[in-house]
Amino acid sequence: MSLRERTRPGLGIIEPCLPSPAKAPPSGPGWLHEIKHDGVRIMARRDGARVRLITRHGNDFTARFPLAVEAVSALSARSFLLDGEAIVTNERGLAVFDLIRHQRHGDDAVLIAFDLIELDGEDLRRTPIEQRKRQLAKLVRGPQAGIVLNEVFEGDGDILFAHACKLGCEGIVSKRLGSTYRSGRSPHWVKVKNPKAPAVKREAEEDWR
């Protein structure tokens, strides 16, 4: 069942934007690039003191990731909707899906925030991605134990992808500058996976998440 079908009206959670798969990063200017971390896609919703962490399939993982909940609760705005990835890292600082998959590691999960969809009642979905990123950076500022910004790279996506593969990351996601936020699969978000990453070898990963 989809997130759109399972979410109650008024909850303030939307179906996330999904990157389109590609064999190589887009070339030329007009794109920003980010590391794709191997974790659980999360929509983090805060309304006053209430925080919800919802997966892309509509599962409520709020109780599973207490550190992320605490961090979201500590941010300065009263109401917002963040898009991100909950991860648990190994001793090398690499996100490992098998660690977050098992509930015994949930207390260590950190939210990697990469988009801001709503802020204090303002719908930002039609706002260009670079402006949403700036507003997100103002919201998630300074060291936080349970939430960090996903670093953004501009320039040659092939170079970042090569580094991501060397480090053992899942891959990268490239996003077109000026693009808006749209639920479902988007041609303006492009993902390229490291062929040697565990995520590529894992069967039915999307069914679990």
Which residues are covered by each model-predicted region?
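Catalytic cores of nucleic-acid ligases and guanylyltransferases
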Residues: 1-209
